[in-house]
A protein has these predicted regions:
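Sec-dependent bacterial lipoprotein signal peptides
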Residues: 1-23
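Membrane-proximal, proline-rich intrinsically disordered regions
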Residues: 4, 25-72
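Conserved, well-structured interaction surfaces
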Residues: 46-47, 51-52, 86-157, 180-183, ...
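Extended ligand-binding clefts on enzyme/binding-domain cores
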Residues: 48, 52, 240-270
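Alpha-helical solenoid repeat scaffolds, predominantly canonical TPR units
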Residues: 115, 185, 192, 239-242
């Protein structure tokens, strides 16, 4: 994990160096140039800032999609790779992932986590409009995204580097961060998310003909999964019930299949 963070910061440094190599001639002599941005000058102190932060982080979460499905399903009981599958896919299915496996890189996971940490550190949750702390819903959602990403990373890697502050310098990248296994991490994430149970769910209306409410991670969904892993079944049931009740979720015949006793070889929609 530490090697990854070092490489991550080296890559960031190379990009910054390349950008710095081509300044305008006039800017080279001006120490007050407005084209230079400093970390301490960037605050997320308006509802628009928080909105764009959440959507930006979600765009990074999309990069985890293939790995999330493959690392989960290929190691499950109901799926296996064929002999014609790519070697990386076969390695996952056989629980023998090599260091060169395309899906073994955790760079994108830590990238999401680092951006979540940055937003969490910079968002001013004390801003009040009409007696409403307007930044809390986005702040809570970013915490949920970070928790989900950490959990998926831990399920894939077995343990993670627990980092709560944004890594913005080489010095920060070289620090020794505590390693957390699944049980310790699950409890840390539960403690981190519990204060935001009941936070207003995000709803940005329809975006490109898609209901934006379905883009976000329900806090009770993540909490339920964490409780379930720890064997706290009553707490898991409570979290899942809150989610079902709030969202008025129901199951109908369209969600199920049945087999009759005469012929189990074919299934029919209920």
């Amino acid at each position: 994990m530490k090697t990854f963070i070092k490489n991550y910061m080296k890559a960031v440094g190379v990009v910054c160096a390349c950008m710095a190599a081509f300044p305008a001639c006039t800017d080279m002599m001006e120490t007050d140039s407005t084209t230079v941005g400093f970390e301490e000058d960037n605050r997320l102190d308006s509802p628009n800032d928080s909105l764009y932060s959440v959507l930006g982080i979600l765009s990074q979460v999309q990069r985890l999609g293939d790995r999330y499905v493959l690392l989960g399903e290929l190691r499950g009981d109901l799926m296996e790779a064929t002999a014609d599958a790519h070697v990386d896919i076969q390695e996952i299915s056989n629980f023998s992932v090599s260091s060169g496996n395309e899906y073994a890189s955790f760079y994108d996971y830590y990238n999401v986590i680092n951006n979540c940490n940055y937003a969490i550190a910079k968002m001013d949750t004390n801003i009040v409009f009409y007696e409403d702390k307007v930044m809390i819903p986005e702040y809570a959602q970013i915490k949920v995204i970070r928790a989900w990403t950490y959990w998926q990373l831990a399920l894939a890697a077995g343990k993670v580097s627990w980092i709560e502050e944004p890594v913005l310098s080489l010095e920060a990248a070289l620090k020794e961060y505590p390693q957390k296994g699944l049980e310790d991490l699950a409890q840390l994430l539960i403690d981190d998310l519990t204060p935001y149970v009941g936070a207003r769910a995000l709803d940005y209306g329809t975006i490109d003909n898609f209901d934006s409410r379905k883009m976000f991670f329900p806090v009770d969904m993540v909490l339920g999964d964490l409780y379930l892993f720890l064997g706290r079944y009553a707490d898991a049931a409570t979290a899942y019930y809150r989610l079902i009740d709030k969202r008025k979720l129901t199951l109908t015949g369209a969600n199920g299949y049945y087999w009759d006793n005469a012929a189990r070889g074919s299934a029919s929609g209920a």
